[in-house]
Curated annotation (Swiss-Prot):
One of its GO terms (biological process) is exit of virus from host cell nucleus through nuclear pore. Keywords: Host nucleus, Host-virus interaction, Transport, Virion. It is found in: Virion; Host nucleus. This is Nuclear export protein. Pfam families: Flu_NS2 (PF00601). Average number present in a viral particle is estimated to be 130-200 molecules.
């Protein structure tokens, strides 16, 4: 995985964990958890692509990997919508920068996951 992507994930997660949004902290914690799960999924998919021989074991171990992939895209769309929602409501520049960067990272990760998944098909 690209070291910039790792740093971006870590930076955004760290900044989000320090925030207190007007919405509930449960919403923010849910977003943080989703980001962490997305990072882990992206990493594992990327590793599978690098070891193309793992494609068959991936398919055998998880016959529903396409359903899982679809679910991850739904999660990405949900996170994008949440980031946009927060951006429309907040006037705090720290939050704006954080969520703009999170939005950019989500779009990059979505593109990477699409690329990985096409390589696995």
């Amino acid at each position: 995985m690209d070291s910039n992507t790792i740093t971006s994930f870590q930076d955004i997660l760290q900044r989000m964990s320090k925030m207190q949004l007007e919405s509930s902290s449960a919403d923010l914690n849910g977003m943080i958890t989703q980001f962490e799960r997305l990072k882990i999924y992206r990493d594992s998919l990327g590793e599978s692509v690098m070891r193309m021989g793992d494609l068959h074991s991936l398919q055998n171990r998880n016959a529903t990997w396409r359903d899982e992939l679809s679910q991850k895209f739904e999660e990405i769309r949900w996170l994008i919508a949440e980031c946009r929602n927060i951006l429309t409501k907040t006037e705090n520049s720290f939050e704006q920068i954080t969520f703009l960067q999170a939005l950019q990272l989500l779009l990059e990760v979505e593109s990477e996951i699409r690329t990985f998944s096409f390589q696995l098909i």
